[in-house]
């Protein structure tokens, strides 16, 4: 099988430096293997991801020199490449899992899920307590009169492990560390975990490059691959890009977004500085994606989060 990587951004705003680093690493990693690059737009939440944001994202990626072989504008055998247009695939998989008695309706509200008494992981994430796991048919019918349910996947009390291409060995007990997780929300929107597994498998993705914040999503996704009889890709997680004071970047951080950076820097200047922070550009000199190919190696990247020094992207002379 031809190696295939992808970048799959969510167009909820202008892309920021963290998004750019993700796309760059995915592009470099698969291009070094002479593989194909897919672009998929993860716009399941259409209210937060209007099409104009997707169009701007495509233009930004072109400007950065990060091209793709399949996806919006170039088409391909697995179109459409917008998740909002692929819901029939997700519906069929949900039905298959439901018929195996692996899915159940959940009527818990957000407030109930996040109550102080709810079980939490050490990192503060809420674990589902299994409140609706064993409802009777009568209870389900009664609760359905009051609100539409979400759909959750039953997980076993088992360890699921994998060896990440950069972070190394990782494992979780699905019941203890994850809990039964959502496949579809109560408003009908399919969950990321189901959609990403189905799309990566359908599109022949062999390598998934993404931020370390998604490392703990991998065991539950591997479980879904197993249940659905699909071949899982290799996973490579990279350290997160943080502000100087340790905050996660988001599309609300205007100083890290391309709307602020494009008027002041060339694409090569942005990529060169990001590559320097990530450890595979010996200095912060401007480099195109093509020029970075010869120096890129996963061995050069750190495993701990990367902080952007104060003023590093303030102006061209800040380095």
Model features per residue range: what roles?
Residues 69-73, 183-187, 225-228, 239-240, ...:
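Short C-terminal domain-edge/linker segments immediately following a structured domain
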Residues 1-117, 121, 212-213, 217-230, ...:
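N-terminal Rossmann-like or analogous alpha/beta NTP/dinucleotide-binding catalytic cores
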Residues 1-14, 32, 37, 64, ...:
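Non-catalytic terminal extensions that flank enzyme cores
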